[in-house]
Amino acid sequence: MWTSSQTSKSKSNTESTSTGKTSRVVSVFHIGRDLCGHPGFVHGGLLSVLFDEVFARCVSAAFPSGLGMTANLNVDFRKPALPDRMYVLQVETTKVEGRKAWVQGRMTYLPVHLPVPSDGIEAIVPDSALLREDAEGSVMVAEAKALFIEPKFADVSIIFP
């Protein structure tokens, strides 16, 4: 999995954060055949886990402690996820209020089948093809929204002897 994140100062009047930061994360990854729930289809639970993990990385910039826990995660599956594809997961923090942060994202894949040659060297896909907002021919697999909460104990340091 390749992940890139961007943090910026809050520019919107509707966003209020204690850190003044919003963030975006783009993750690119390959899902192979061993992660299928039914033959030929990637297990939906895996997609939910990927959303949760990347969402957590995204909202961590919004909290002083860098720790956020999932309070609610809603995933809307749009099309079946197919194996042996390159997936792009784009997420952003949409709102932060105190210890709460809302995040949303979308997962797409490029329809090109990317076989791994017998020499083991993976096919190379240009970054520009993966990172465009609406890459030509990309297929929307799922959209998700989540609420993360910074735990009250996050700022407490416990030192064990």
Feature map (PLM): residue ranges:
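Structural signal for hydrophobic/aromatic residues that build the beta-strand cores
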Residues: F51, L73, L89-V91, G105, ...
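Short histidine-centered catalytic/ligand-binding loop motif
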Residues: I31-G45
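Short beta-strand micro-motifs enriched in acidic
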Residues: S4, R78, E92-V96
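Hydrophobic beta-strand-centered segment that forms part of the acyl-chain substrate-binding groove
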Residues: V54-V88, A101, I121-S128
